[in-house]
């Protein structure tokens, strides 16, 4: 199925690219999320007329994401208290929701879907580096300090 991309999509293309994807991927993911439209003659003409407007909107979203990433980077460290045993092993774990709540409480609004934990959930006390994917191209890092209650 031919679609026109309205946003940058990983491993597929960027704004304005006309790509061929499987019908289910287009119908169930790209079109409902507003990342693509079917490549009909009407849509191609409509897109070409609005191309500059869409590019400006994309640049505005990227600038807002960069501003949020700078705010997150400015936090540097966030402390989370959790129950732990004698050797520093946590009872339970600290996941994306806990980290997102702690950063939001520190003053920067973050969704749990933006938190990236490359080594999985945090299960020990100490300092852990956590990254945030604010936009497909914009990342921020924060040190999460886990202390025992």
From Swiss-Prot:
GO cellular component, one term: ribosome
Annotated SUPFAM superfamilies: L9 N-domain-like, Ribosomal protein L9 C-domain
N6-acetyllysine modifications at: 89
InterPro entries cross-referenced by the UniProt entry: Ribosomal_bL9 (IPR000244), Ribosomal_bL9/RNase_H1_N (IPR009027), Ribosomal_bL9_bac/chp (IPR020594), Ribosomal_bL9_C (IPR020069), Ribosomal_bL9_C_sf (IPR036791), Ribosomal_bL9_N (IPR020070), Ribosomal_bL9_N_sf (IPR036935)
UniProt key word Acetylation: yes
UniProt xrefs under Pfam families: Ribosomal_L9_C, Ribosomal_L9_N
Annotated GO MF terms: rRNA binding; structural constituent of ribosome
The UniProt record lists the keyword Oxidoreductase: no
Range of residues in the leader sequence: none
Functional note: Binds to the 23S rRNA.
Protein name: Large ribosomal subunit protein bL9
Organism: Shigella dysenteriae serotype 1 (strain Sd197)
